[in-house]
From Swiss-Prot:
Stated name of the protein: Integration host factor subunit beta
Lineage: Bacteria, Pseudomonadati, Pseudomonadota, Alphaproteobacteria, Hyphomicrobiales
CC terms in the record's Gene Ontology section: chromosome; cytosol
Organism, scientific name: Parvibaculum lavamentivorans (strain DS-1 / DSM 13023 / NCIMB 13966)
InterPro entries attached to this UniProt entry: Hist_DNA-bd (IPR000119), Histone-like_DNA-bd_CS (IPR020816), IHF-like_DNA-bd_dom_sf (IPR010992), IHF_beta (IPR005685)
Quaternary structure and interacting proteins, as annotated: Heterodimer of an alpha and a beta chain.
GO molecular function: DNA binding; structural constituent of chromatin
Gene that this sequence comes from: ihfB
Transcription among keywords: yes
Function description: This protein is one of the two subunits of integration host factor, a specific DNA-binding protein that functions in genetic recombination as well as in transcriptional and translational control.
Amino acid sequence: MIKSELVARLAQANPHLYQRDVERIVSTIFDEISAALARGDRVELRGFGAFSVKSRPARTGRNPRTGEPVHVDEKSVPFFKTGKELRERLNNADIADDKLMVDDSDDGDD
């Protein structure tokens, strides 16, 4: 699924929202996650997973064409660890279909 497909599915599941508003919301979420990671923060979405940044040390690699050693600088890379609920859902044999599932059970009337 690409970003435009995500926006279209969310807009379809929420007909009270305009697609352009959904697109702004999705873009803002991605921008905020990116900004938090750039600051070195961890972003946790309970039940889904956590985004963090890991540091890869400098090392000596090899040029695949020549076999010649090359220096690879230290770098930071994004890392995603799945949450327990997502892992269970992915490993559950009775995943019904490809529909977007929205949990409307908690409507805040408790």
